[in-house]
Swiss-Prot record:
NDH-1 is composed of 13 different subunits. Subunits NuoA, H, J, K, L, M, N constitute the membrane sector of the complex. It is a peripheral membrane protein. [4Fe-4S] cluster 2 binds at residues 70, 99, 102, 105. This is NADH-quinone oxidoreductase subunit I. Its main location: membrane. Its EC number is 7.1.1.-. It is an enzyme of class 7 (translocase). The gene is nuoI. Residues 161-174 have a biased composition (Basic and acidic residues). [4Fe-4S] cluster 1 binds at residues 60, 63, 66, 109.
Length: 180
């Protein structure tokens, strides 16, 4: 009985060693990160940015849907209104030390203002440095959707043009004319 246990123990040890040595000649998966570039998948969800319209205005209309959709509550913003009646965020803050990069804020945004980029290098030594303000998040370009403008697509009046005269917009429909 004792000899059988010894033979079993030696067998398991030899099996373990054979597994280790069989993997010794396989190619390594480890990368020397700063020197070698890491492949990020095309749909990788990384750092969040705020985009601008093709006109240069910020797309965010401070609807607060992103903050409501965020499961960890890392987004906070305050709505304000310009002279022309357009809403904008007075402040927009994301705490990246709490963010789980789930992408729900991007899906909830009706204006495509919030977009996730493949950037993943966000290491900081202090937690306070991971709280990004609106100025840190705004980029100069329109991001993934270069031709999209929320105010044109939604049919809201643009200064100097009545409804129906903007690009990609039809004249308002008179419902009574459709009746038999």
């Amino acid at each position: 009985m004792k000899i059988l246990r010894i033979i079993q123990g030696v067998g398991t040890q030899l099996r373990s060693l054979s597994m280790v040595f069989s993997h010794a000649w396989h190619p390594r998966e480890t990368l020397n990160y700063p020197e070698e570039a890491v492949y990020a998948a095309p749909r990788y969800r990384g750092r969040i940015v705020l985009t601008r319209d093709p006109d240069g205005d910020e797309r965010c209309v401070a609807c607060n849907l992103c903050a409501v959709a965020c499961p960890v509550g890392c987004i906070s913003l305050q709505k304000s209104e310009r002279d022309d009646g357009r809403w904008y965020p007075e402040f927009f803050r994301i705490n990246f030390s709490r963010c789980i990069f789930c992408g729900l804020c991007e899906e909830a945004c009706p204006t495509t203002a919030i977009q996730l980029t493949p950037d993943f290098e966000m290491g900081e030594y202090r937690r306070q440095d991971l709280v990004y303000e609106k100025e840190d998040l705004l980029i100069s370009g329109p991001g993934k959707y270069p031709d999209y403008n929320f105010y044109r697509m939604s049919g809201m009046a643009i200064d100097g043009k009545p409804k129906g005269d903007a690009e990609n917009e039809a004249k308002p429909i008179d419902v009574k004319s459709l009746l038999p």
